Amino acid sequence: MNCPSCGAPMRLESDAESLTCDYCGSNVFPEKTDDGVRVLGAPTDEMCPKCSMGLVDAAFSGVRILYCTRCRGMLIGMEVFAALVQTLRNGQEGGIAPKAPDRSELDRRLNCPHCHQAMDTHFYAGPGNVILSDCERCSLDWLDHGKLLRIAHAPDALREEAEA
């Protein structure tokens, strides 16, 4: 992306939701998509495991992820996944009862965008009735469109017990 002020190339800040122009010093915070994702860059070398389009650098609630602009899936590092879910859950009252998952998703086979090996597809162990795919070797979780928010907005019996 080029700077809207001077036209020079912009640099993606590490651990930030912005791009910086080294020439004029401008910072650009891209608009959020209707999913709440800030798309920060052009496609990377890593391909979407679902639709084979190049994943882009993006940020969601301050956490850097890779995002597919076609199917809107998210590739999230396991080391930040739980903290991201907690951030999204904080401040929420109650929860939305999740719909039943599509069990046919358990039969799909996705390859990790990083190592290209088969990902493990399974039920998420927390709330939300979500099926996700992960790569233990690369410590990455793949969530289809809407599933992260489904996890965040689902009632959580363990959380409710802790608050009681």
What are the residue ranges of the model-derived segments?
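Intrinsic N-terminal pre-sequences and regulatory tails
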Residues: M1-M47, E161-A164
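Short cysteine-rich clusters marking metal-coordination/redox-active sites
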Residues: C3-C6, C21-C24, C48-C51, C68, ...
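Short, structured motif recognition centered on aromatic/hydrophobic residues
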Residues: M10, T20, V28, M74-I76, ...
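Short Cys/His-rich "knuckle" micro-motifs
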Residues: E13-A16, E31-D34, A58-S61, M78-V80, ...
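Cysteine-rich micro-motifs
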Residues: E17-N27, V63-G73, N129-D141
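Short amphipathic alpha-helical linker/capping segments at the junctions of internal repeats
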Residues: R38-A42, L88-R103, I151-A164
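Intrinsic, low-complexity N-terminal interaction/targeting segments
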Residues: P43-D57, G62, D102-S133
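Structured core of small recognition/catalytic domains
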Residues: I131, E136-R137, D141-A164
